[in-house]
C-alpha cells in the first residue's frame, strides 16, 4: 500500500504508535509518536528502503535507583537499538539519513541546569554527527508539543506543531510516567544487553 498518497489523517489512523522509551522498524506501515521534551529520530536507508523511529526521554543513562529503566528511556540506548536493528534488516550505515523532532519546553523548568528538551536535542545532533549520519531535517525546541508521522518505506516524515495546553502537557507527562512505571515493574532481564559503543 502506498501510504504517501493518503491524507494525513488517514496515515495517522493507520500508523503504529511509538511510546516513550520504544523504537520500531516497519517495512511499510507508518510510525507515529507524540512528543513533548522527548525526541524522536527517524533513520532511513533510501537504497534498502528500510527505516525506523525511536522515542527517548533522556539523553544519557542517569545513575540512580533503577539503572535498567533509565537506560531503556535514554537516547544512547534508543539510538544504538534502532541503528543495530536497521543494520540487521539490510541497511548500510554509510547510506543512513536522519530526521529528528522534539525537545520542546512544555513544562516550565527553573534553575541553572539546561532543560531536558535542549539536552535531548543537543545529544541527538552530537550522536548523529559522531556516527556520520546526516541530519536532513529537524524541528527542535520551542514551546510546542509535536505529532510526528514517519513513512519508513519512503523516508518521508511529517511534523505537526501543537500549542501545548495543560491537557496536552498532562497527557504527555502521564504517558511518559506510565511507561517508566511499566518498565520499573518488569523483572530484570538475563538476556544479552545491547552494547553501547
Curated annotation (Swiss-Prot):
It holds the Pfam family CheD. GO terms for biological process: chemotaxis. It comes from the Bacteria. The keyword Hydrolase applies. InterPro entries: CheD-like_sf, Chemorcpt_Glu_NH3ase_CheD, Cytotoxic_necrot_fac-like_cat. Its EC number is 3.5.1.44. Keywords: Chemotaxis, Hydrolase. One of its GO terms (molecular function) is protein-glutamine glutaminase activity. Probably deamidates glutamine residues to glutamate on methyl-accepting chemotaxis receptors (MCPs), playing an important role in chemotaxis. This is Probable chemoreceptor glutamine deamidase CheD 2.
Amino acid at each position: 500500500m502506498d501510504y504517501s498518497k493518503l491524507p494525513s489523517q488517514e496515515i495517522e489512523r493507520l500508523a503504529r504508535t511509538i511510546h516513550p522509551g520504544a523504537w520500531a522498524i516497519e517495512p511499510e506501515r507508518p510510525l507515529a509518536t507524540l512528543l513533548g521534551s522527548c525526541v524522536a529520530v527517524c533513520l532511513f536507508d533510501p537504497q534498502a528502503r528500510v527505516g525506523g523511529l525511536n522515542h527517548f526521554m533522556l539523553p544519557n543513562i542517569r545513575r540512580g535507583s533503577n539503572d535498567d529503566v533509565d537506560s531503556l528511556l535514554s537516547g544512547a540506548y534508543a539510538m544504538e537499538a534502532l541503528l543495530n536493528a536497521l543494520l540487521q534488516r539490510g541497511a548500510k550505515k554509510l547510506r543512513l539519513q536522519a530526521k529528528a523532532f522534539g525537545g520542546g519546553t512544555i513544562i516550565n523548568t527553573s534553575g541553572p541546569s539546561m532543560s531536558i528538551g535542549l539536552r535531548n536535542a543537543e545529544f541527538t545532533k552530537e550522536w548523529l554527527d559522531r556516527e556520520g549520519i546526516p541530519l536532513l531535517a529537524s524541528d527542535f525546541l520551542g514551546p510546542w508539543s509535536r505529532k510526528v508521522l514517519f513513512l519508513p518505506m519512503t523516508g518521508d516524515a511529517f511534523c505537526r506543531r501543537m500549542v501545548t495546553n495543560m491537557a496536552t502537557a498532562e497527557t504527555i507527562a502521564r504517558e511518559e510516567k506510565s511507561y517508566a512505571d511499566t518498565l520499573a515493574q518488569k523483572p530484570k532481564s538475563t538476556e544479552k544487553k545491547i552494547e553501547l559503543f
